[in-house]
């Protein structure tokens, strides 16, 4: 797909809105790395999310799993005048004439905001240009009182990521169709305490362990539980 101009994106309201009404500045179909892009559905808001890499997909799932986070805005555009000013003050070449973006701008339940930048590994810090752009991004947020966090894909807990991906398709009760999906629903809605970080979930064993909880859920949701 042909890249869209900044003017056109602004006209479409890209980078505006919150929660289910947020419109990311960049959409997955607009980048060349389509093989690693993904469009998961936010199980809490129903919005289609625009993620540009496998690392972004992993980090987004982990952030979304955190109930202290109430909003995640991906591909968030930075104010062009501010970034040009930062570039000028520190003698850094601005990356093009279009807005820079932050991978994720997160809003916490307590009102705190955190900006996340994701990189593949610490090896990228050996590249001077990458460090310059990260410095600009960090300066942009810190000067506005927003915490900035740099995350490396190599540090992401893939067990947690895969476990989250396993259960969240059953977040809504109407998606439940058998005992295995009941367990996944109960985990996704955090009605049963499960260690998600240490080992892959074994649904067969969990069905045995939480047999009473499954029966109780079916009893309370008899209109949905037709299996």
Residue ranges and their predicted role:
Residues 1-227:
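Electrostatic, structured charged patches in enzyme active sites and in nucleic-acid/phosphate-binding
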